[in-house]
Amino acid sequence: MPSDDFVKTARKALISHSVSIQNYTEDDCQIAFHATTNSFMQTIRLVHIFFCTFGAISSSLFIYVLLNSSSRNLHRNLRISLASLAFAALIACLQLDFIAFYHLALTLTADNACDSMYEARKCAILRFPVVLSIYATLCGIIVLAIERTIATLKYKTYEANGSRVVGLVLVTGQWFVCIIVAVFSVLLRSDPGYVHYCTAYVSHPRTSVFSLCFMSALEVATLVYFVLLLQSNQRRQVNEFVNKAMHSLSERYQLQENVRIMKILIPSITVHAILGFIGLGSMLAFAIIYRYADERLIVGFAPFSEVVLLVIPIYAVVFPIVAVVQNKQLRLASRRALPFLFNPESPETSEMLPADPPPLHKIITSRPSRQLEKESNTHFDLLNEMWKK
């Protein structure tokens, strides 16, 4: 496609008006009724209910683990950022669950085919939490990139000087920006009138394609940036081990923490990017098949839209699993906060359990590894004080 044609297509997509119609006929009612009640859409709704329910449970448990005292060994900004991402997924799962149940109940109780028509503005309000969650996830990933950049550049003083304030300010900014963008997006595309099916984007699918392309490109760029940050921290970590006398214990701890956090974030964001590309592929398929569709044929976009939205609950299920599996500290915190989900006899779990009380009579035993670690930390603290002098 020539560059001029591509620019014209992009401009047309970005300024596409809502596909709502001002007046509907009996034929419109029948089209909407068929789109709502056909067996394929009913199956998609049941799949939505299944994944959204498990996604909401998974996100809730993950947030509980991050806020529980068992995860206090994790970096506070990591907990804040991960909890923010999980909260965004939780909002979307709850709203998608509600929408699926609502549509299912409406299908079973509808007496008139015209009851399947939706007011465009009510549809926009109904789908607003989902749109908010999509932007909150993207903004959250960008916020993580900013926070990790600060931690990398200021690793010598980051742990001691205001890191909690940095995390809270960034997360507050994340939600402020995503709320403004989501409200603007909904207001821009919620024209008066009626739609045949209530999708997340009440507009032509071309708009969704270009929006998803932009978000996917931004996410891939952020992922590449995370990989570069990981390599930078690993190089500094190697230099720290070679020249230990030139680095304090706080600096060494922060470098190790940076590497551990990046190894959590990269797999999690990779999963989200892969799922996003799957959704983008579905949108592109529809845009190619229905390139010149008018408002009344856009209802065929509904199945593609619902399949794409499955990305959100699937990510809500996969994201906590990947984060827990990739990080031992987070895994141990999960075992302690949610013992009913894990094997209490696991060797990892035993590391988090309190030590047994000493016996009444003296016996010769080796000291617990945790005691040795405590004494080792005390020893290094003393050495650090000597180095400072």
UniProtKB/Swiss-Prot annotation:
Positions bearing carbohydrate: N23
Any one Gene Ontology molecular-function term assigned to this protein's record: G protein-coupled receptor activity
GO CC entries: membrane
Localization per record: Membrane
Membrane-traversing stretches: 46-66, 82-102, 124-144, 168-188, 209-229, 269-289, 304-324
Membrane topology category: Multi-pass membrane protein
Main location: membrane
Keyword annotations of the record: Disulfide bond, G-protein coupled receptor, Glycoprotein, Membrane, Receptor, Transducer, Transmembrane, Transmembrane helix
The family this protein is said to belong to: Belongs to the nematode receptor-like protein srab family.
Protein name: Serpentine receptor class alpha/beta-14
Organism of origin: Caenorhabditis elegans
